[in-house]
Amino acid sequence: MSTPMYNQTTNQNAGFTGPEGTVVCFGVLSYLQLMLVEQVPIHNGGNTIRQLTDSYGDDAAIVSGMLQQLGQKSKFIPSAVGDDDLGRKVTATVSGLGIPVDVRIDSSVDTVAELSISDPSGARTYFYQRTPELMATLDSADLSPLDNASFLYVDWYDGDHILRAMESAAQSKIPVFMNLESQYLNKEVLAKFAPYTDVCQVSVDQPESNYDMESISSILLHSGISTALIAGGSDRSLAVNSSQKVRITAPKVGVVDGNGAGSCFSASYIYGSLRGWNLERCSRFATAQASLKCRTPGYQVTSVVEGERIADTLQTKVDYHN
């Protein structure tokens, strides 16, 4: 079993100092086994494993680690992990990588387990095991890092457990970035989270995605969200706010592992936003970085310089509206 191939403490963007304030990422800390294969086998079939890696999740944890690589100070507020083998494995993994997190161990819960199978098409097939008891440990997580925060990141799939952090951020006028994935038609989710959300990211590379990007962005803006980011995988992306729409064609890359690409998009957008970049520049950079991430296994992020270089080459169309 291999371990992730980068170290946050010696990242290539160490000289890129960020603005004052920490990006706080709030969510579940899970043990993830990353499996790279040439092709996902047919049902009741098999195939060769190219690489097997002890890794970590969920998206909030990944975004926090990627922000650190980009040179942006971050802090991950996690759920607890169990006093079990998987808990010890993921604790060792995030510690070795320098992920900015204080791991809590709770012997009454089982560590969240995930298996992500990634193939060169960019697709991921994943399995996970969560318990209500584990999720409930988010309700007692220490929110004091929000006192000096510049942004809050959350994942919709952590449910009502993220509301406490979102409400706290809103009271302190801290912008909130929510990963909504494919839940743009889920009225209950939007009604619950949209009032606290400033930036929302949606993924439309799932098989069930039948709506066009512009329709999705309209749904999100009409729900009260200020900025909608629609990530279309290897094809394109769309960013929309009250005054403009930015359509970006993604660069073509040789895909090794699509795991973490959405998180890289999120982290890169937040990185640019905190530096005062406009919507087009943030979206170009996020699209470039998410695509470039797919060239390597795991969560290695391309340097800011290289990401900006590729971002400047992307075909982009900007429309302004009232």
Task: Outline where the language-model segments fall.
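Glycine-rich phosphate/adenosyl-contacting loop at the front of the ribokinase-like
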Residues: 1-77, 85, 92
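Conserved N-terminal subdomain of the carbohydrate kinase-like
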Residues: 16, 20, 45-50, 69-150, ...
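Glycosyltransferases and closely related glycan-assembly transferases
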Residues: 147, 163-176
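Conserved phosphate/ATP/ADP-binding segment of small-molecule kinases
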Residues: 170-247
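Structural motif
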Residues: 22-24, 150-151, 199
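Conserved phosphate-binding/catalytic region of the ribokinase-like
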Residues: 2-24, 213-322
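Catalytic beta/alpha-barrel core
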Residues: 152-158, 179-181
